[in-house]
Amino acid sequence: MEFNRNGIRFEYPENWTIEEDSSPDGIFSITASAPDGAFWSLSRQPAEVDFEQLTDFTTKQLRGEYPDLEAYPASDDIFGSSLSRADFNFSYLDLTNTAEVRCLATTNAGYVFFCQAEDRDWSHLHHVFRAMTTSFIRGTIGKGPSSD
C-alpha cells in the first residue's frame, strides 16, 4: 500500500492500519500499525527542531513507562541520508521489546521515525520498518535509485 498525503509519501504493508494526527504548531504524525501491535511512526517537525532534545524527551518518556529501559546511540545511512539517534530495549508484560528512534534533517523539515516491536518479531519487522523508511526517503525526499 502507499500513503501519499500532506507532502509525505511511503509504502507500507497491506494489512497494516494508518492513523494521522496534526497539531496547531505544524507537527504532522503518521503511525502505521501491524495487526500484532508493532508500529512505525513518522513525525514531521519544523526544520529547526532540536533532535537531541527530542531524543532525550523520548528516552525519559520510555524510561518512565519501562524502568528497565536500556538506551544505546545508533545510526543508519539510507541513500546517503544519515539518520541517527537511539535504540531501546525494554520489557513489557513479560515480553522483551526493541524500539528505534531515528532523525532526519532536511532544509524544509525535520523528520522523526519511531518503530517498536516485540523481540520475537523484531528480526522480521526490522526489515519492514527499514523498507518503510527507505520508501519515505525515496518518495518524499527524492533520494535513491528511482530519482536518478
Task: Annotate the PLM regions.
Residues 15, 35, 79-81, 104-110, ...:
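Short, solvent-exposed coil/turn segments at beta-strand boundaries
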Residues 2-56, 60:
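Secretory pathway targeting signatures of secreted, lumenal, and periplasmic proteins
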Residues 16, 113-148:
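Surface-exposed amphipathic alpha-helical segments
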Residues 57-108, 145-148:
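Signature of long, low-cysteine stretches enriched in small and polar/charged residues
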Residues 25-40, 106, 135, 139-140, ...:
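Short, charge- and proline-biased low-complexity linear segments
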Residues 51-52, 94, 119-123:
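Loop/helix-junction capping segments adjacent to catalytic residues or to phosphate/diphosphate-binding pockets
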Residues 2, 15-22, 63-78, 138-139:
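Short secondary-structure junctions
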Residues 1-5, 32, 76-77, 88-90:
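Short acidic-hydrophobic surface loop/beta-edge motif
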